[in-house]
């Protein structure tokens, strides 16, 4: 018996995992370079940011539901169903959730959902928990939640999809981190010129 199957629900899930960060990065770059979303929101950049936040949030929930549905259609590996693995899965989920929720709290709604691409820049780099223990707590916490769900359901396919989540987020960071640094460097340069 196979330990996982590449079926339609698995493939749909793999596509949804890849599309989430791709689409929000395309939308955010378009906003930064052309004010596309602000134009759609009648010139209100805060409203545009909230609209993107809602889209990202809903897309994340849809992706998570697709993931759970895909796992339900996969074979279960019995070794994952023992109490030790299930306990570890619960701990991983709790830690991942703490990373995600505490980073959302620290960043606020606008900071969490790409507000810097809309011109809403934080006064300084966020420090303190969870950013003092992890550079990317949202992405790493989310990845841990995927991992815990795979273990909880006892699905090897979930582990493979979790690996995809990990690599998709790493690729997204290759684009996001330098671009965000560029946005803040431009702001700092502008402020330095004003103070001269």
UniProtKB/Swiss-Prot annotation:
Major place of residence: endoplasmic reticulum
GO molecular function: phosphatidyl-N-methylethanolamine N-methyltransferase activity
Amino-acid positions noted as binding S-adenosyl-L-methionine in the UniProt annotation, renumbered to this chain: 94-96, 176-177
Primary enzyme class: transferase
Membrane topology recorded in Swiss-Prot or TrEMBL: Multi-pass membrane protein
Pathway assigned in UniProt: Phospholipid metabolism; phosphatidylcholine biosynthesis
Transmembrane segments: 41-62, 90-110, 154-174
EC number, as in UniProt: 2.1.1.71
Key words, A-Z: Endoplasmic reticulum, Lipid biosynthesis, Lipid metabolism, Membrane, Methyltransferase, Mitochondrion, Phospholipid biosynthesis, Phospholipid metabolism, S-adenosyl-L-methionine, Transferase, Transmembrane, Transmembrane helix
Family recorded in the similarity comment: Belongs to the class VI-like SAM-binding methyltransferase superfamily. PEMT/PEM2 methyltransferase family.
Listed PANTHER family: PHOSPHATIDYLETHANOLAMINE N-METHYLTRANSFERASE
Designated name of the protein: Phosphatidyl-N-methylethanolamine N-methyltransferase
Taxon lineage: Eukaryota, Fungi, Dikarya, Ascomycota, Taphrinomycotina
Gene that this polypeptide is encoded by: cho1
């Amino acid at each position: 018996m196979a330990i996982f199957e590449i079926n339609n629900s698995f493939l749909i899930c793999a596509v949804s995992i890849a599309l989430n960060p791709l689409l929000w990065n395309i939308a955010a770059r378009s906003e930064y370079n052309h004010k596309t979303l602000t134009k759609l929101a009648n010139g209100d950049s805060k409203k545009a940011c909230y609209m993107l936040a809602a889209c990202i949030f809903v897309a994340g929930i849809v992706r998570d539901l697709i993931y759970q549905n895909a796992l339900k259609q996969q074979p279960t590996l019995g070794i994952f169903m023992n109490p030790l693995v299930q306990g570890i899965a619960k701990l991983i989920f709790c830690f991942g959730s703490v990373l995600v929720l505490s980073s959302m709290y620290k960043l606020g709604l606008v900071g969490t959902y790409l507000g810097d691409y809309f011109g809403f820049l934080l006064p300084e780099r966020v420090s303190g928990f969870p950013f003092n223990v992890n550079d990317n707590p949202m992405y790493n916490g989310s990845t841990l939640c995927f991992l815990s769900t795979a273990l909880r359901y006892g699905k090897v396919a979930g582990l493979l999809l979790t690996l995809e989540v990990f690599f998709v987020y790493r690729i997204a960071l290759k684009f996001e981190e330098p671009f965000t640094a560029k946005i803040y460097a431009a702001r700092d340069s502008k402020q330095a010129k004003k103070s001269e």
